[in-house]
């Protein structure tokens, strides 16, 4: 149930929504509803959508960073690479854990972190 003033839904852009959908469906098992010029996703921990745009989300240009949690960060890194992602910031330590950043096939930047 939605909670007052809590993040309820997230949307991000993609110049190639089909490539973004294929990546997240195959790598993480997300489910999608396809609409004209819009994809709604479920099964990601937070529901959201992908809309067509020439813009992509990158940390270097001030975009928000969506960070996934992993029980096995090395396995997650291999998984995203196997499904076409590019590692743009190799795994590094920070207080509380480790993380890496990757670009999915359509160009958006994400990260995966672990406390293990």
Where are these regions (language model features)?
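Amphipathic alpha-helical segments
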Residues: 16-31
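Conserved short beta-strand elements that form part of the metal-binding/catalytic scaffold
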Residues: 29-63, 109-115
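Hydrophobic pocket/interface hotspot
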Residues: 10, 20, 24, 76, ...
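Vicinal oxygen chelate
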Residues: 1-3, 12, 26, 33, ...
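Residue-level detection of beta-strand scaffold positions
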Residues: 9, 20, 38-41, 65, ...
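Mid-chain, well-packed structural core segment of small domains
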Residues: 61-88
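N-terminal beta-strand motif that seeds the catalytic metal site of vicinal oxygen chelate
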Residues: 1-19, 47, 64-66, 116
């Amino acid at each position: 149930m939605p909670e007052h003033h809590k993040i309820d839904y997230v949307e991000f852009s993609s110049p190639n929504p089909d490539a973004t959908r294929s990546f997240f469906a195959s790598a993480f098992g997300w489910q999608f509803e396809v609409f004209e010029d819009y994809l709604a996703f479920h099964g990601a921990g937070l529901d959201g959508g992908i809309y067509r745009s020439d813009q992509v989300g990158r940390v270097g240009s001030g975009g928000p960073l969506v960070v996934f949690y992993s029980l096995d960060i090395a396995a997650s890194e291999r998984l995203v690479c196997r499904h076409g992602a590019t590692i743009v910031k190799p795994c590094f330590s920070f207080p509380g854990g480790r993380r890496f950043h990757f670009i999915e096939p359509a160009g958006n930047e994400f990260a995966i972190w672990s406390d293990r």
